């Protein structure tokens, strides 16, 4: 049986911590809502707070990506924006984004373990190379 989920378009905004993902997500949400488009926005840090779940092991990162996808499936919005680091290819694949925006404005983030784990995406729709 084929999995059924909503028709919301999923936008993944990913990149290293401090690159500007949340700032971009907020601006994109505001822009779309001003145009009358219904948007849900899920920020990974805020979602982790709800689950009291700050596990950054490989399994913890995968769990978070699946959680973000599950949340996106519950939305009736036109667009669902999720901003999270998504350092692993598997995490990006789990989210099943319609569009991926890579915020590539910094070369090193705040957390060395995340810098080591981060695999630059080979596939993305938009790349933001600098903060502005």
Set out the residue ranges of the language-model regions.
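Phosphate-binding P-loop
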Residues: 2-8
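Conserved substrate/cofactor phosphate-moiety recognition/catalytic segment
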Residues: 25-70
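The conserved Walker
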Residues: 17
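Hydrophobic anchor at the beta1->P-loop junction of P-loop NTPases
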Residues: 13
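Small-molecule kinase domains that catalyze NTP-dependent phosphoryl transfer to phosphate-bearing small molecules
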Residues: 93-94, 103-132
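Glycine-rich phosphate-binding loop used to anchor ATP phosphates in small-molecule kinases
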Residues: 58-111
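Conserved lysine of the Walker
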Residues: 21
């Amino acid at each position: 049986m084929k999995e059924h989920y909503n028709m919301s378009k999923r936008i993944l905004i990913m990149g290293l911590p401090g690159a500007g993902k949340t700032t971009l997500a907020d601006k994109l949400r505001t822009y779309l809502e001003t145009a009358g488009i219904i948007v849900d926005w899920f920020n990974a840090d805020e979602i982790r707070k709800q689950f009291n779940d700050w596990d950054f092991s490989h399994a913890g990162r995968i769990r978070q990506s699946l959680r973000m996808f599950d949340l996106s499936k519950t939305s009736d919005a036109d667009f669902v924006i999720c901003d999270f680091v998504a350092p692993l290819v598997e995490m990006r694949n789990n989210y099943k984004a319609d569009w991926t925006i890579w915020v590539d404005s910094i070369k090193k983030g705040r957390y060395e373990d995340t810098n080591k784990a981060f695999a630059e995406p080979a596939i993305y729709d938009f790349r933001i190379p600098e903060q502005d």
